[in-house]
Each structure stands twice: as structure tokens, then as C-alpha cells.
């Protein structure tokens, strides 16, 4: 069924279709089942796999527990790349240190960050420097300008301000005035212009 779904998508668009998978489910032997599963879904024509480096436990664990149990198995993902060298393999699961994770690119094609950058999005400003040797640094003032544009565009589209702003507060974790900034951003009494005007006060933007 997974292969059929992927085949239908690849047949209906020129946009590259990818799949995100786990190493297996429940009591499956991932040494036996994983390669077979991938050989089947690759018949759909996809060329890129995002691989979460642990099994999915469908019985006995809730979604939160499934994020940490069972242990991560990066080595199995590395071997997957060895078995399928012509397929782009992107690693996902437990990645939380750019400097350490960079070494994983010797065995793989890419890294997929999830919870880590959702909780600490300001860390993304380090990506170009660490992974691409860029000499440019994104300062917080530039990010505030980008937030202003993003808020205004989404406000014009009618999206909920709360759903947008609740992720923005994480940009300022670790800043001296993070609590004050969080209160400003999440305030129901301030419009977008007022929020941005306050955030542009440089004394607040101290890491």
C-alpha cells in the first residue's frame, strides 16, 4: 500500500516525492525486514528517504514515549546507505548538536532536525557557518525584521496570530529578557506593529 501511494504521487507530478520511514515496527527484525521494505517502495520511483533511526512501537507506548523508545540506531541507517548507495538517505531522530552531527554527513546525504530546532530555532543561525563555512552571521535584529514580514503576511492571509506567535517565542530562549519578550509576543492587547516596535528596542535583544 505504501508503494502504491508513492507510485500514485510520482505519477501525478514532476515534483520529487520522498518518504519518511522508521527502521521498523514493534518486534520486527530490522536486519531482515528493512531492506526488503525499501526495495519495494523504491519501485515507486522515489529517490530520497528520510529515516528516523528507531523503530515505531505501535503497542504499549504513547506518541511521546515513541520519541525516545527504543534507543536510536544510527549504525543501521549508515548500513542502509551502504546497501542503497544511489538513494539519497537523510537521517532523522535525536539530532541536537550541529558540530557533532556534521560528522554523520560522511556516511549520509543529509540531516533532518525536528524537535531540537522547534525548541531552539535561534540555533539555525549557526547552520551556514558550521556546515557551509559561511563567514556571515544572522543577528537577532535581522530575525526580528523577518518576523515582522512573516507576521504581516500571515495576518493578511487570515491565519491565527496565536498559532504563529507561539513558535516565535522560542527564538529568544536564553536571552536576558526572554520572559519579557515572551509576554510581549503573546500579548492579546498588542497588534503586530506594536509587537515589532517593542522588539526593535535593542536593550531587549541581549543574548
What are these model-predicted stretches?
Residues 1-207:
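Flavin-dependent oxidoreductase catalytic cores
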Amino acid at each position: 500500500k505504501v508503494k502504491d501511494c508513492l507510485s500514485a504521487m510520482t505519477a501525478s507530478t514532476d515534483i520529487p516525492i520522498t518518504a519518511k520511514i522508521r527502521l521498523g515496527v514493534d518486534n520486527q527484525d530490522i536486519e531482515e525486514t528493512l531492506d526488503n521494505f525499501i526495495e519495494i517502495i523504491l519501485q515507486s520511483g522515489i529517490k530520497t528517504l528520510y529515516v528516523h533511526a528507531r523503530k515505531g512501537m505501535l503497542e504499549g507506548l504513547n506518541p511521546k514515549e515513541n520519541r525516545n523508545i527504543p534507543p536510536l540506531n544510527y549504525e543501521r541507517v549508515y548500513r542502509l546507505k551502504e546497501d542503497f548507495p544511489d538513494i539519497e538517505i537523510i537521517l532523522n531522530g535525536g539530532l541536537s548538536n550541529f558540530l557533532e552531527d556534521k560528522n554523520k554527513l560522511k556516511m549520509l546525504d543529509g540531516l533532518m532536525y525536528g524537535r531540537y530546532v522547534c525548541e531552539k530555532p535561534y540555533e539555525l543561525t549557526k547552520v551556514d557557518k558550521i556546515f557551509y563555512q559561511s563567514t556571515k552571521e544572522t543577528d537577532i535584529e535581522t530575525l526580528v525584521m523577518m518576523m515582522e514580514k512573516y507576521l504581516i503576511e500571515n495576518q493578511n492571509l487570515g491565519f491565527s496570530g496565536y498559532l504563529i506567535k507561539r513558535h516565535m517565542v522560542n527564538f529568544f530562549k536564553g536571552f536576558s529578557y526572554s520572559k519579557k519578550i515572551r509576554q510581549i509576543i503573546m500579548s492579546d492587547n498588542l497588534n503586530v506593529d506594536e509587537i515589532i516596535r517593542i522588539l526593535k528596542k535593542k536593550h531587549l535583544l541581549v543574548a
